[in-house]
């Protein structure tokens, strides 16, 4: 899709003019993105940040480019670097009704924490900082008949890259 078509679709969908934070579903990722943007504001430089934006059957390796503008604004653009097929398709369902006590309000079972940056998964409640690629984790378990229920966060590897 070219930039003109994307701009038209984004405008028609009400995306343009909204705060970036409205599209981020968890506090940790929201703070991560705010820190990236603020670092470019404080020390004007272009920052290149790799991330993943997968589909159910493809790993999409992307790069976010954060650039300060002369007028004080920040330009954020995205570039697709490469695509790889997943070994097995996997879908996710975001659990959004989540209390501070880590219990779902609507009785959904949370399976994993999904890193918003690299898309790796950590079993929910696991404290050993082991994160897995979705397709390798699924390949070792049964075939999935439903979406994996996840909450989002940022793994320590991705947090370390922010420094």
Which residue stretches match the model-derived regions?
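Sensory/regulatory domains in signal-transduction proteins
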Residues: 1-94
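PAS-family sensory modules
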Residues: 38-42, 69-163
């Amino acid at each position: 899709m070219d930039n003109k078509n994307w701009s038209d679709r984004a405008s028609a969908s009400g995306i343009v003019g909204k705060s970036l934070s409205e599209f981020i579903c968890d506090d940790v990722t929201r703070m991560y993105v705010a820190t990236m943007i603020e670092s470019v504001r404080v020390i004007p430089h272009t920052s290149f940040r790799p991330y993943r934006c997968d589909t159910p059957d493809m790993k999409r390796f992307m790069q976010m480019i954060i650039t300060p503008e002369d007028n004080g604004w920040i330009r954020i653009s995205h570039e697709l670097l490469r695509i790889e097929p997943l070994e097995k398709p996997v879908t996710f369902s975001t659990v959004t009704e989540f209390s501070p006590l880590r219990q779902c309000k609507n009785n959904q079972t949370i399976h994993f924490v999904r890193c918003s940056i690299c898309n790796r998964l950590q079993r929910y409640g696991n404290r050993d900082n082991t994160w897995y690629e979705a397709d390798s984790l699924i390949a070792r378990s049964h075939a999935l008949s439903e979406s994996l229920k996840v909450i989002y966060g940022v793994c320590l590897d991705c947090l370390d890259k922010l420094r």
